């Protein structure tokens, strides 16, 4: 299960802000 402010996606958890970021910006947070 993901924390309440994260979203499950393809077996991973993402914070909502990643939805409006492009892939390169999102990868910098990994």
UniProtKB/Swiss-Prot annotation:
Expressed by the venom gland. GO terms for molecular function: metal ion binding; toxin activity. Coiled coil: none annotated. InterPro entries: C-type_lectin-like/link_sf (IPR016186), CTDL_fold (IPR016187). Disulfide bonds join 2-13. It is found in: Secreted. It comes from the Eukaryota. GO terms for cellular component: extracellular region. Keywords: Blood coagulation cascade inhibiting toxin, Calcium, Disulfide bond, Hemostasis impairing toxin, Metal-binding, Secreted, Toxin. Residues 1-30 form the C-type lectin domain. Calcium is required for ligand binding. Belongs to the snaclec family. Anticoagulant protein which binds to the gamma-carboxyglutamic acid-domain regions of factors IX (F9) and factor X (F10) in the presence of calcium with a 1 to 1 stoichiometry. Heterodimer of subunits A and B; disulfide-linked. This is Snaclec coagulation factor IX/factor X-binding protein subunit A.
């Amino acid at each position: 299960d993901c924390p309440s402010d994260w979203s499950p996606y393809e077996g991973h958890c993402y914070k909502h802000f990643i939805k409006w970021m492009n892939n390169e910006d999102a990868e910098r947070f990994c």
